[in-house]
Amino acid sequence: ELQNIETQKPLFYPTGFHTFGAALQDYAALTPVEALNVASVVLPAVSLALSAAFLAWVMVGRRGLTGALAAGLAPVAVVGVIPVFYVEYYTGAWPNASALSMVGIAAAALMKVPERPKMIPAAALGFAGVGAVHPSAIPVVAVIVALWWLLWKLFVPTGREQGKRGFFRGVWLRCKDVLLIGVTAIAGGA
């Protein structure tokens, strides 16, 4: 059990990365070194590509060919982020690297909640999962979602297409979007 050296009080340390490595070791019959290699290299690589794909898909906002092309080409653009990965990897910050590579997945899930409220449980679990791997990624998700709301959803709220107009209707739609995202984030963080 981790504890503070000076006060002897217990410390919180997220165990998501280590639990993933232990599960790999048990279920895939890997040695500890092999499990660490998979957890520290493959997990961030795959989740970074998925994060880029999900964020591109959300930014394009379409399900057709344009969305598919954006989601397919976004991981190629992530290759430029490779130096950041090596800094994290060679300093031994493997949980941090894994959590930061999952940020786009959690942010994209939270961004879809105002359009599809039935995604609240999945988005909350995704947000909680990123925090379980390493809590340093939670503010990054919050900043991405807040900027998305301020720069896009504030001007184009979710229920705008329904035809009803008016100041109070617009305020209600924006408040509803913030409430749905906030409830999801709180449920994931609790």
Q: Residues of each region from the PLM?
A:
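Membrane-interface alpha helices of multi-pass inner-membrane proteins
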Residues: 109, 119-135
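Perimembrane helix-loop-helix junctions
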Residues: 140-185
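Helix-loop-helix junctions and helix-breaking kinks within/between transmembrane helices
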Residues: 91-95, 131-147
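Transmembrane signal-anchor helices characteristic of membrane glycosylation enzymes that use polyprenol
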Residues: 78, 183-190
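Hydrophobic alpha-helical transmembrane segments
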Residues: 69-73, 120-125, 138, 142, ...
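Specific aromatic-rich, kink-prone transmembrane helix
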Residues: 97-115
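Transmembrane helix irregularities
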Residues: 27-28, 80-81, 129-137, 187
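Active-site lumenal/periplasmic loops and adjacent helix-entry segments of GT-C-fold
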Residues: 1-102
